[in-house]
């Protein structure tokens, strides 16, 4: 009888150890964060050519990136540099599907609101005041369902968008506001109004 009880305790102990190891195995997420170099972005202006006027320039770029599960990967501001007729900047991404939201030339008000973004639906709810806007104006673009792949150490990143694979993520941005000035002239004639 003591022998049967001893065997039961041993079997129970083995099952508990196996159960604990399986539970721990399921809790460890697969690290798929792209920790190597950041992904280069090629930013094209959708409505203007660079250099036309101050409104057609990009000075800073904020990349807000989410993975396919809607988890925030990156929400950072980096400087943008002009290379020929394309602005370039950097953004972090994960291996797999990414959704990129690019905001250029953010105002102080817009920067405060964008810094608080942690969920993908939050981006569409953000508004800002364009009163007193000075050049360069804020611009916005997005690339959804971009597939990022890289070596296991994060090097040699490639991005595929619309079945085209390249080492640079192409982004087209358009102005979020317009600045204009006008002069009103009333034609005064001696007749009736």
What do these predicted ranges mean?
Residues 23-26:
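Bacterial signal peptide processing site
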Residues 32-34:
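Non-catalytic accessory regions used for complex assembly or targeting
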